[in-house]
């Protein structure tokens, strides 16, 4: 809990492929672990090793998942997406985040041999919507750089490991 006069920790919506492929699950776990330094990760289940390649199961089915994710997206202060593994869902989430005016960081690994969609790379404006190329070994450094440079007012009270 933030002390009086401090801002509450950041709420982070993390996007990563679920039904589009789980090849990057271990990387997602590293990303979510690092994001926890900066606040509450609303979608940490994306990094869960138990989440099957066929995707999430919920009592309410796909419609429940859609509504829950949109609610979390509206609550989020920032959106972080790992976009190397192509995913229709991640693209949809990013479009909705843009419409909501959320700050967005997309992370892409060119070494994967994939080419990032022009609809993602072309949306980058150098401010509200960022697309950063990175190597897997530097993901934590990239996240630290983003949160310290672009969201310092939100992370000042939550950048220590116990947050």
UniProtKB/Swiss-Prot annotation:
UniProt: 5-hydroxymethyl-dUMP binding residues: 16, 18-20, 87, 89, 93, 117
Q: Name one GO biological process term.
A: epithelial cell differentiation
Q: Where in the cell is it found?
A: Cytoplasm; Nucleus
Q: Which InterPro entries does this one have?
A: 2'-dNMP_N-hydrolase, DNPH1, Nucleoside_deoxyribTrfase
PTM sites of type N-acetylalanine: 2
Any one GO cellular component localisation term in the record: nucleus
Q: What does the record say about pH dependence?
A: Optimum pH is 6.0 with dGMP or dCMP as substrate.
Q: Which UniProt keywords apply?
A: Acetylation, Cytoplasm, Glycosidase, Hydrolase, Nucleotide metabolism, Nucleus, Phosphoprotein
Its Enzyme Commission number(s) read 3.2.2.-
Which Gene3D superfamilies does the record cross-reference, listed alphabetically? 3.40.50.450
The reply to whether Acetylation figures as a keyword in the UniProt entry is yes
Q: Which residues are reported to carry the modification Phosphoserine?
A: 17, 87, 112, 117, 127, 158
Subunit description: Monomer and homodimer.
Protein's name in the database? 5-hydroxymethyl-dUMP N-hydrolase
The gene name on file is: Dnph1
């Amino acid at each position: 809990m933030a002390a009086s006069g401090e801002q509450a920790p950041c709420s982070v919506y993390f996007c990563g492929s679920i039904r589009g492929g789980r090849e990057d699950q271990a990387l997602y776990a590293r990303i979510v672990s690092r994001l926890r330094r900066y606040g509450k990760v609303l979608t940490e289940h994306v990094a869960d090793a138990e989440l099957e390649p066929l995707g999430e199961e919920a009592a309410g089915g796909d419609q429940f998942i859609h509504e829950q994710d949109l609610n979390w997206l509206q609550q989020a202060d920032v959106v972080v997406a790992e976009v190397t593994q192509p995913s229709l869902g991640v693209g949809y989430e990013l479009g909705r985040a843009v419409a909501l005016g959320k700050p967005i960081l997309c992370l892409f690994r060119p070494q994967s041999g994939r080419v990032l969609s022009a609809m993602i790379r072309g949306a980058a404006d150098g401010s509200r919507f960022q697309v950063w190329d990175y190597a897997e070994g530097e993901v934590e450094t990239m996240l630290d750089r983003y949160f310290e440079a672009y969201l310092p007012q939100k992370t000042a009270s939550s950048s220590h490991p116990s947050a």
